């Protein structure tokens, strides 16, 4: 990713999960007559999809009945909301889950889905850069209009940075190749049982050798064992998990577009044909009020961008996404062409739930509620804005990521 300045000092984070904490800020109204149970939990060192699966297992219910508002870094301590599609939940049965503590639970009429957050508050211990230099860089970034709103690397996998590659295969209808890449990717996987299954398709041996902790891989292999095909195998996984593959590829495309925008125009350019949105204090855009930049309003919008009232956006490609009617629109089309993808490819003819109409995302943001004491920094970011991306604008980020055999998203 392109950075606004050439800051190359390394910032190391996540030596321990406790070095990186995040608390979700949500607006969920309790309702004693609600049909859903909301749980706020302290979660340590769990992948979000895997802890959701464990919650479902402890409650003896389908994984599909457990939802959450946002995926979080695995190697971290999270205060996170989960929604159980039942008003009758034995919350005490969750007490035995390692590194998981229920902080509060209540009934609600609100069904929690991805994106149902206002913001996230972070507290991060960092190493390798002087705190005063960190503060100077922060002041510089704020004065220059913020940091580029890239999707963070964790969007593409905690350990195996290939979810966007799997997503592209799904979009192109290459389901067998997508399943195989999920089960075994030679760039990341060293376990012999993974490669053996891909080489032989011997599902009996695979189900004996794959550990039960790799529940998603086992589900895919089990589907193949029952059906003799990979085409519908992703139906055996939670839908929100499979959709994340598609979203990861869309995020990859957005990052490519934003990177090109920065190279050509920088972070703060306002072009005729750009689409802008009003933003709140957290830099959450109001997408119900798009504004197209033209020669008459360009100067006014530039001033509103400078005062953090408005932000320019770029497309997240889908089958309904409009390409910018600006000088930059040709670059957006060019990236699709380079990828060998059309917008129609995002309308999945085999599995409707894997279709995506697309979206737009603002190109820059700022942290708020910033504080720095010694080598611990705290700040708040709007939903979908990545703390690791902000840190990458301060210096070269070094994340400590597990190298164990668990395949994670």
From Swiss-Prot:
Its EC number is 5.4.99.27. Pfam families: TruD (PF01142). GO terms for molecular function: RNA binding; tRNA pseudouridine(13) synthase activity. One of its GO terms (biological process) is tRNA pseudouridine synthesis. The active site is at 73 (nucleophile). It comes from the Archaea. It catalyses: uridine(13) in tRNA = pseudouridine(13) in tRNA. Disulfide bonds: none annotated. Keywords: Isomerase, tRNA processing. Residues 146-365 form the TRUD domain. The keyword Nucleotidyltransferase does not apply. Belongs to the pseudouridine synthase TruD family. Could be responsible for synthesis of pseudouridine from uracil-13 in transfer RNAs. This is Probable tRNA pseudouridine synthase D. It comes from Thermoplasma volcanium (strain ATCC 51530 / DSM 4299 / JCM 9571 / NBRC 15438 / GSS1).
């Amino acid at each position: 990713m392109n950075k606004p300045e050439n800051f190359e000092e390394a910032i190391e984070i996540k030596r321990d999960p406790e070095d990186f904490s995040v608390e979700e800020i949500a607006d969920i109204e309790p309702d004693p007559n609600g049909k859903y149970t909301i749980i706020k939990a302290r979660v340590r060192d769990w992948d979000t999809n895997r802890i959701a699966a464990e919650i479902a297992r402890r409650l003896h219910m389908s994984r599909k009945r457990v939802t959450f508002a946002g995926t979080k870094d695995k190697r971290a301590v999270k205060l996170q909301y989960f929604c159980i599609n039942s008003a009758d939940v034995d919350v005490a049965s969750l007490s035995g889950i390692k590194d998981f503590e229920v902080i509060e639970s209540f009934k609600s009429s609100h069904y929690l889905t991805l994106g149902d957050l206002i913001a996230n508050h972070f507290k991060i211990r960092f190493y390798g850069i002087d705190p005063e230099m960190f503060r100077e860089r922060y002041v510089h970034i704020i004065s220059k209009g913020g940091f580029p709103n890239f999707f963070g690397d964790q969007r593409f996998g905690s350990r195996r940075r290939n979810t966007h590659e799997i997503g592209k295969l799904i979009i192109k209808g290459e389901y067998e190749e997508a399943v195989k890449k999920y089960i075994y990717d030679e760039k990341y996987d060293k376990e012999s049982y993974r490669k053996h299954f891909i080489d032989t398709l011997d599902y009996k041996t695979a189900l004996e050798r794959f550990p039960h902790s790799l529940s998603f891989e086992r589900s895919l292999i089990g589907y193949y064992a029952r059906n003799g095909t990979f085409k519908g195998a992703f139906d055996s996984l939670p839908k929100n998990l499979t959709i994340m593959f598609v979203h990861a590829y869309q995020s990859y495309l957005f990052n490519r577009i934003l990177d090109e925008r920065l190279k050509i125009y920088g972070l703060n350019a306002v072009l005729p044909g750009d689409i802008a949105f009003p933003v709140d204090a957290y830099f959450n855009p109001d997408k119900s009020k798009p504004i197209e930049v033209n020669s008459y309003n360009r100067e006014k919008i530039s001033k509103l961008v400078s005062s953090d009232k408005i932000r320019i956006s770029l497309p997240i490609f889908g089958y309904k996404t409009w390409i910018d009617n600006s000088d930059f629109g040709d670059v957006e089309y060019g990236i699709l062409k380079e990828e060998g993808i059309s917008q129609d490819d995002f309308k999945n003819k085999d599995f409707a739930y894997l279709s995506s109409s697309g979206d737009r995302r603002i190109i820059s943001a700022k942290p708020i509620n910033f504080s720095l004491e010694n080598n611990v920094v705290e700040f708040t970011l709007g939903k979908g804005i990545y703390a690791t991306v902000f840190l990458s604008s301060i210096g070269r980020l070094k994340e400590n990521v597990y190298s164990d055999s668990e395949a994670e998203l």
